[in-house]
């Protein structure tokens, strides 16, 4: 009998840093300011990592890539996702699918949604759907002071 699927959720929020490259969904948005962070500040990739780790019961981004781990300083969200994919496989899990929603006014995700979905799906070896929303001017994302992301993931034990 197959094990039941496991679901995880992940969130991430970072303030905008003037002049920092904007990495989001594994993509560079060259005309936008990026987010502060120990790594590249890609809130979507970090939320996906958290969702995958949560679903597999393997901790969270802070435990795996935290500031106490200097080897991960400045690392790309894409590299983090590849590492998490390998960690899940090494622990007997297969990724079924994932979804990530970016919360913020900029950058505009819609024009690059297909590109992001293809990249992220390739990185984790499973379908990833991408969406985006705003907070209608409320909170730090609404004021353009930061970006947030929420992700879910489905995994099964092999």
UniProtKB/Swiss-Prot annotation:
Subunit annotation: Homotrimer.
Q: Where is this site: Transition state stabilizer?
A: 38, 134
The secretion signal range is: none
Pfam families from the UniProt entry: YgbB
What does the entry list as the binding residues for a divalent metal cation?
12, 14, 46
The cofactors required by this protein are:
a divalent metal cation
User: Which InterPro entries did the record assign?
Assistant: MECDP_synthase (IPR003526), MECDP_synthase_CS (IPR020555), MECDP_synthase_sf (IPR036571)
- Substrates-to-products reaction catalysed: 4-CDP-2-C-methyl-D-erythritol 2-phosphate = 2-C-methyl-D-erythritol 2,4-cyclic diphosphate + CMP
Keyword check for Lyase, yes or no: yes
Task: Kindly list the positions annotated as binding 4-CDP-2-C-methyl-D-erythritol 2-phosphate.
Answer: 12-14, 38-39, 60-62, 133-136, 143
The gene from which this protein is expressed is ispF
Function (record text): Involved in the biosynthesis of isopentenyl diphosphate (IPP) and dimethylallyl diphosphate (DMAPP), two major building blocks of isoprenoid compounds. Catalyzes the conversion of 4-diphosphocytidyl-2-C-methyl-D-erythritol 2-phosphate (CDP-ME2P) to 2-C-methyl-D-erythritol 2,4-cyclodiphosphate (ME-CPP) with a corresponding release of cytidine 5-monophosphate (CMP).
Where does the source fall among the domains of life? Bacteria
Assigned keywords, A-Z: Isoprene biosynthesis, Lyase, Metal-binding
- In Swiss-Prot or TrEMBL terms, this protein is called 2-C-methyl-D-erythritol 2,4-cyclodiphosphate synthase
Question: What PROSITE patterns does its record include?
Answer: ISPF
Enzyme Commission no: 4.6.1.12
Family indicated by similarity? Belongs to the IspF family.
- Name the Gene Ontology biological process terms: isopentenyl diphosphate biosynthetic process, methylerythritol 4-phosphate pathway; terpenoid biosynthetic process
Q: Does the keyword Protein biosynthesis apply?
A: no
Cofactor: binding details: Binds 1 divalent metal cation per subunit.
Q: Name one GO molecular function term.
A: metal ion binding
| Pathway as given in its UniProt record | Isoprenoid biosynthesis; isopentenyl diphosphate biosynthesis via DXP pathway; isopentenyl diphosphate from 1-deoxy-D-xylulose 5-phosphate: step 4/6
